[in-house]
């Protein structure tokens, strides 16, 4: 019989023939697997693919990545093993099991010490202190004396502190990084599995150093679902303490409800001890006896609103020392109330007495207005504090209001609903508030779009808040209406009065006034040179008293071109060649982007304004109001800007004077069609009204003389000025508006201050 044919696989020697061969069970987890060529080979491609899928799924489920050449760092430093949450006895007795003997591994300890996280003792004997960074609630401090014992303070979630005394050599070793522990900030507190090197393997092969590091360092879960627990917040621990405290003082509540009551009001009967020098009078004594304190539960997102209690609550309470006497909230007791539990028992003890005597009218207008009388729910403090408990219980009991949790999400809706309820009902304050402060809320006509009954907090329409909100003033002891159109009309009237006081309409055209002013200046100069000319001047000026009043201006505003030459004929009558040269030098030397300037070394002082650069034809609001279809828009823009810039420059150069007067006229007008146009006249008065809206833009004691370009233009300006006077006189003759009207308080017959327009 022939010998069997040798195969290629028989040439390789078997590892089991060697003496130092170890089986799979005898091999340690950190030893490297030596795979031979024919060993552990997959039989097919599909089995290898399934094996790869299973290995990747396992890595994803355990949240561990493959080994890399770099050592993984600890992502969450609060997971160090020096803090532990175990029982009080196991912290002190079982600490030796938590720190295995890993200190013998010299190579790993050397690597960690090289990273300068664990302190290395210095060669000399000096005492050097190493302070590790703060980790969670623990702080480690090492000294160079390795034989000294250190104390690790571990703050437990139960609120007590315990110490662990260990040798500094073992704690400072790599066991800090490799030892499994319980995390005190985790709710479940389970230990996380970590491998440690056995004692019989002291010498570690260099080839396995990487696998040891990757397995020794604990990997932190990346998601909350894989972490096995979420950190316990401080608010959660406080709520647990509240529940434990409330369960000890609620014997009458069933056991299944004892832990659900976490938001209760503690009745404080004894006043808080204060210093002797702090005396608050009767108000302090009242609040000490009648204020119910409340606890805010921030973790559950609710807040209990404090309310003022009365003296009857103290008399009707079960006892001053009893705490947390809440109502029973089980569904069975709500549906089938027993005979022993009456309706008064099911009502809350905190607001029982206050809701018994609150009538329907006071509940609908429950606005606490903190003024001199301090009315609380329609009653003053003295009245509510001095009432007898018997009188309160004898009043007819009203049905209980629907109670709703006062969270921050619907707080604004509740406030506005209170204001709406107060505005719908007419509140009589004669019984609670003294007679001088009496006002009634009335319905307004909503056709004008200014209704006093709205859903926002801004329109506080309750009777109690009428006396302190939105009242501009009072006429004949009555409060002015808060209607928006009325307030706007009053503001326009005030600006119109200011305009009438600060604007003087000249009966002489501006060109003639400038000529007379030049003559007056020349005469004054001659008067200084020759005293004999004084008598002749007084005789000649006695007949022109009306014109001399309009000549009392010290500043004149003119319109010029970009090269310094006069723009209009009115400016040309005042500016000669010498003055035009000085204006041109001022423009070149002191260029200003606002295209205006002044010359103060002249009498009268000169304010010059240049026209605006032409822009695209965009119709503005003022152009549409003035209805200037026949006038160029650039012309109106120059009229308004010229007037505005001249007034601002006039205020700047005369801010140190007590008073000043400036002559103005319609600027940048070159034809009769332009200066006599209704749009030009309206633009002038609208700009003056807009400037006087802010008094800071006007000279404090300054006035302007408005003169026309031609005699016809003077008449048109005078007519517009008289219309403003008439509108103010008619509105003042209307008298005070009645607050009991069913329509808007503004009279339909009155004339508005929109210049010349009737409502």
From Swiss-Prot:
Biased region (Polar residues) positions are 473-482, 736-759
Compositionally biased, Basic and acidic residues: which spans? 10-42, 485-495
The GO cellular component terms are: cell cortex; cleavage furrow; cytoplasm; nucleus
Effects seen without this gene: Mutant embryos do not display the anterior cortical contractions associated with pseudocleavage and do not form a pseudocleavage furrow. Cortical actin foci remain uniformly distributed rather than the asymmetric distribution seen in wild-type embryos. Approximately 20% of mutant embryos fail to hatch. Those that do hatch are viable and fertile and display normal P granule localization. Increased embryonic lethality in par-1, par-2 and par-3 mutants.
Where is the segment annotated Disordered?
1-46, 334-361, 379-413, 440-495, 732-759
Where does this one sit in the cell? Nucleus; Cytoplasm; Cytoplasm, Cell cortex; Cleavage furrow
* Keyword vocabulary terms for this entry: Cell cycle, Cell division, Cytoplasm, Developmental protein, Nucleus
GO biological process entries: anterior/posterior axis specification, embryo; mitotic cytokinesis
- Where is composition skewed (Low complexity) in this entry? 448-465
Could you tell me the superkingdom of the organism this chain comes from?
A: Eukaryota
Protein's job:
Required for formation of the pseudocleavage furrow during the first cleavage of the embryo and also mediates aster-induced furrowing during cytokinesis. Promotes cortical recruitment of ani-1 and nmy-2 during pseudocleavage and cytokinesis and promotes the accumulation of actin at furrowing regions. Regulates establishment of embryonic cell polarity.
Q: What is this protein called?
A: Pseudocleavage protein nop-1
- Its gene name is nop-1
